[in-house]
Amino acid sequence: MPHSYPALSAEQKKELSDIALRIVAPGKGILAADESVGSMAKRLSQIGVENTEENRRLYRQVLFSADDRVKKCIGGVIFFHETLYQKDDNGVPFVRTIQEKGILVGIKVDKGVVPLAGTDGETTTQGLDGLLERCAQYKKDGADFAKWRCVLKISDRTPSALAILENANVLARYASICQQNGIVPIVEPEILPDGDHDLKRCQFVTEKVLAAVYKALSDHHVYLEGTLLKPNMVTPGHACPIKYSPEEIAMATVTALRRTVPPAVPGVTFLSGGQSEEEASLNLNAINRCSLPRPWALTFSYGRALQASALSAWRGQRDNAGAATEEFIKRAEMNGLAAQGKYEGSGDGGAAAQSLYVANHAY
């Protein structure tokens, strides 16, 4: 086998590794605030608010105006392109607001899922064209990490070998391009919770998908110490009649990761996948209490599971902004504890216990 040319210098590797470690420092995770305009339409319609650029800005301001309490539990915030260039009411760019708290800025760079021909309704993700130039610009504009989401689903015939391979290679190409531009890639192969499959089936599929992803990352000479993984937790399908405990979910999840994710990866930042806010916190907590050795930081990269209570409290009213921000801070602190295995549960019925599941979820 020919020797691979060193794609990254020692300085580039150190920068990437330092960024990744900062994001997943003990007790810290990621706020995923990278919903597309279409996804924001769904969120805002739930509270009867029109999906305008100004309303999206006002909502993001609710999250980003959180005080210094979030510094200890949020290591990074993922922005959508529009948000990266928006400002708060005082004319301060959101990027600067976040950076001044010592939190790193990330950017969603994929362009959404598209059908994968020759499969049973499976998809790949587009956005590689022009990615090199976009990454260079985003780095100049303050982004230190990026996110790219691929989607797989479980059914009798899926995921197919073709879909697994194609999505693994797309993620690897994206990761390589990011690293060349000093941006840490978050690799997100999401296995949707749609279906009635049990925990074992999800664990089996998760292992096959992650094994393919890390083979592709190796083939593309991606520097693992300068990456993060954003997987689904191993959970039963949403329509599965069997209910599993957080401890069972934790054991299946950590087992799948131990079989597939190299210890060189600094951190695993789970997506919430339509779990309720409380469920996502309890499961993350159980994962961090799991008796199996865990060489990576195991933390959160939550969107809906950090925002649902805040969105309900805000309802598009300026007068509610302060209360909504408090709801977000409260949830962020709870997940910061869960990322250390120190969360005891909120006992919260209400909004925090509401399922956030969306069938066939697209961003």
UniProtKB/Swiss-Prot annotation:
Family membership noted in the UniProt record: Belongs to the class I fructose-bisphosphate aldolase family.
GO cellular component: axon; cytosol; postsynaptic cytosol
Residues annotated as the enzyme's active site: E188, K230
Pathway as given in its UniProt record: Carbohydrate degradation; glycolysis; D-glyceraldehyde 3-phosphate and glycerone phosphate from D-glucose: step 4/4
InterPro entries to which the protein is assigned, alphabetical: Aldolase_I_AS, Aldolase_TIM, FBA_I
More details: In vertebrates, three forms of this ubiquitous glycolytic enzyme are found, aldolase A in muscle, aldolase B in liver and aldolase C in brain.
Expression tissues: High expression in the adult brain.
SUPFAM superfamilies assigned to the protein according to its UniProt record, in alphabetical order: Aldolase
Positions of post-translational Phosphotyrosine modification: Y5
Protein source organism: Rattus norvegicus (Rat)
BP-aspect Gene Ontology terms: animal organ regeneration; epithelial cell differentiation; fructose 1,6-bisphosphate metabolic process; gluconeogenesis; glycolytic process; response to hypoxia
Name the record gives this protein: Fructose-bisphosphate aldolase C
Chain residues that bind substrate: R56, K147
Modified residues (N6-acetyllysine): K111
EC annotation from Swiss-Prot or TrEMBL: 4.1.2.13
GO molecular function: cytoskeletal protein binding; fructose-bisphosphate aldolase activity; identical protein binding; protein-containing complex binding
Alphabetical list of CDD domains matching this protein: FBP_aldolase_I_a (cd00948)
Site (Necessary for preference for fructose 1,6-bisphosphate over fructose 1-phosphate): Y363
Positions where Phosphoserine occurs in the chain: S36, S39, S45
Subunit field text: Homotetramer. Interacts with ATP6V1E1.
Reactions catalysed, as given in the entry: beta-D-fructose 1,6-bisphosphate = D-glyceraldehyde 3-phosphate + dihydroxyacetone phosphate
